[in-house]
Amino acid sequence: MRILPLIWISGILASSVAEASEPGEVAWGFETASPVRSSPSIGGGGTVYVGSVDKKVYALNGATGEKKWEFVTGGEVLSSPAIGSDGTVYVGSVDKKVYALNGESGIKKWEFLTGDKVYSSPAIGKDGSVIIGSLDDHLYALDGRTGVKKWTTKIGDVGSSPSIGLDGTVYVGSLDTKLYALDGKTGEKKWEFKTQGRIGSSPAIGLDGTVYFGSVDDKLYALDGQTGAKKWEFKTGGNVEGSPVVGPGNVVYVGSEDKKVY
């Protein structure tokens, strides 16, 4: 059974898209103690990992919704978990920390303390590095096995989640209105692009390396991933805080606070 997760006010719903007698039939629901604002991630064996405002990270059986384990952090978990090649679950918390958890048991492998709240979701590089931002104005690269800091770069408060290009370049937006491209090995800035509003949208990367993202200036941008040069911009009727996706035929889909999807 393939599971399509849907978030509800204080829990997680799973709707079956493979075996339901009716489209969108609810397969199961799991209730947490507080709203769920994190997006679920699916690991090996179909386990669903998700964070909650109740300060916990949950691992759920993807077929039944039964809880496998929970891990308590010191703050709300708004960050969406990322899963390493070995099954390790990486997630940030409002308690200023980044956690690495054993995907099978939920036992903590390590934690890393940043200087402020972590809303950003991690991205995992080809070498296993965990890239994540904090509201302390910095983007961090951590060793996925040990949690040791490899590099950190000051770029402004990071509410956006980073994306990693095929060449290892890290792209991330900041509340300082800029999108940054950083060298994934060193954290050195390659280029930056300024918009007219804060960026909470996480970048999407096309097959040709084009970087797409939205801004609170109501626009969707397309930038050359190598140079940062603007290819085009599209103005919507409202803030673009959601993250775009790139579909077949290089079609870009994005939502806006003008109540429309483009």
Feature names for model-found ranges:
Residues 18-262:
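Extracytoplasmic/lumenal domain signature
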